[in-house]
Amino acid sequence: MPREIITIQAGQCGNNVGSQFWQQLCLEHGISQDGNLEEFATEGGDRKDVFFYQSDDTRYIPRAILLDLEPRVLNGIQSGPYKNIYNPENFFIGQQGIGAGNNWGAGYAAGEVVQEEVFDMIDREADGSDSLEGFMFLHSIAGGTGSGLGSFLLERMNDRFPKKLIQTYSVFPDTQAADVVVNPYNSLLAMRRLTQNADSVVVLDNAALSRIVADRLHVQEPSFQQTNRLVSTVMSASTTTLRYPGYMHNDLVGIIASLIPTPRSHFLLTSYTPFTGDNIDQAKTVRKTTVLDVMRRLLQPKNRMVSINPSKSSCYISILNIIQGEADPTDVHKSLLRIRERRLASFIPWGPASIQVALTKKSPYIQNTHRVSGLMLANHTSVATLFKRIVQQYDRLRKRNAFLEQYKKEAPFQDGLDEFDEARAVVMDLVGEYEAAERENYLDPDAGKDEVGV
């Protein structure tokens, strides 16, 4: 029985990435731009109903809710080539249409105003599912809507659907290039909700995405469309085991359980290979892709979609490689042995040091230039370095009291700036949790007692 997943897209980034994701899913399942099954799509064996439902006229409609506080991106989707696949009742544009002005407080306060309408949509989709497993939430944490309205919705969804899983795909800002000066404020406040209200967070950051696109396509300035295409490739690859189910990892809880042994350390990194012309136009085709080649490349830092600074003690908590295409299980076994012999991945001292592998088929409707492709979902302790950078940048702004006036105008800060202090404490605790996970006594109940007050 399929376990359905409802996708919620919030803000400019969430909707741009989401629209690419739905295009990709339509291509993979042989669904036309108006939601009808293409005549050649007769293979079967795929579960379309995890992400789509069928309307009375048998068209496939995404289980998607598209939210934004300003109209530009959603208007673009409503007039774009795939405009007819969405349920028009599932678009929500804020009444004023002025957006959240890159202010987390404005986005969060807007949540209070719009929650009734938005949760009507979410409830309607949930009631239309036979066996809802959870939600996929797409947003960026730097602006106002994705971070602020996103935070509000994550809190409320947790209260409203306590037994359903929430998996987010969260785009982090490039911490080196501050296109929005208040990024660190918005990111820190959103990070608190990602820590407390999500079951699993796939961390993608603009710096790494741009670097990978620039590297593969030999372009100086990658466009957002190219980086969004990359994110949608990761999303579609990370859901292949749900859509082409095997006997393992065929639902969201199976994937999350295999990657997240302790509830707070639920931030995942991704790598994907090979980037060829199928994923991004103009990418150079690599010659021969073997399972070993793919698995080795997945472990290379340059293929990671997150800018992190691993230290000597950084290690993997868990790894799941999703291998698509013509992969022989004996090749997989040999590749794992080779990786272990060469010590290409170092694991935590308190858990199993194994790479899990899920083999899935590729869509029969898309012509591929490579035999095998792979996505790595990994839980790695060095993700904490990204969170530390956000806190350091936040501290620099806060020390100068920079731009605080515009936050004080918003409802969440009417009674003071405690919201900031609480968020900082939550993120620092999370950093501490990942650092503790690098030690052997991590699971010892008395561990860390001597270190309090360091």
Curated annotation (Swiss-Prot):
- Note the Gene3D superfamilies from the entry: Helix hairpin bin, Tubulin/FtsZ, C-terminal domain, Tubulin/FtsZ, GTPase domain
Q: What is this protein called?
A: Tubulin gamma chain
- Which keywords label this protein? Cytoplasm, Cytoskeleton, GTP-binding, Microtubule, Nucleotide-binding
An example GO CC term for this entry is: interphase microtubule organizing center
According to its UniProt entry, this protein's organism is Emericella nidulans (strain FGSC A4 / ATCC 38163 / CBS 112.46 / NRRL 194 / M139)
Origin, by domain of life?
A: Eukaryota
The record's InterPro entries line, in alphabetical order, gives:
Gamma_tubulin, Tub_FtsZ_C, Tubulin, Tubulin/FtsZ-like_C, Tubulin/FtsZ_2-layer-sand-dom, Tubulin/FtsZ_GTPase_sf, Tubulin_C, Tubulin_CS
Q: Which SUPFAM superfamilies match?
A: Tubulin C-terminal domain-like (SSF55307), Tubulin nucleotide-binding domain-like (SSF52490)
> Which family is this sequence assigned to?
Belongs to the tubulin family.
Compartments reported by the entry: Cytoplasm, Cytoskeleton, Microtubule organizing center, Spindle pole body
Query: What job does this protein perform?
Result: Tubulin is the major constituent of microtubules. The gamma chain is found at microtubule organizing centers (MTOC) such as the spindle pole or the centrosome, suggesting that it is involved in the minus-end nucleation of microtubule assembly. Interacts physically with beta-tubulin and is involved in microtubule function.
Sites binding GTP sit at A142, G143, G144, T145, G146, S147, G148
The record ties this protein, via Pfam families, to: Tubulin (PF00091), Tubulin_C (PF03953)
Q: Which GO molecular function annotation, any one, does this entry have?
A: structural constituent of cytoskeleton
Give the signal peptide range: none
Q: Name one GO biological process term.
A: microtubule nucleation by spindle pole body
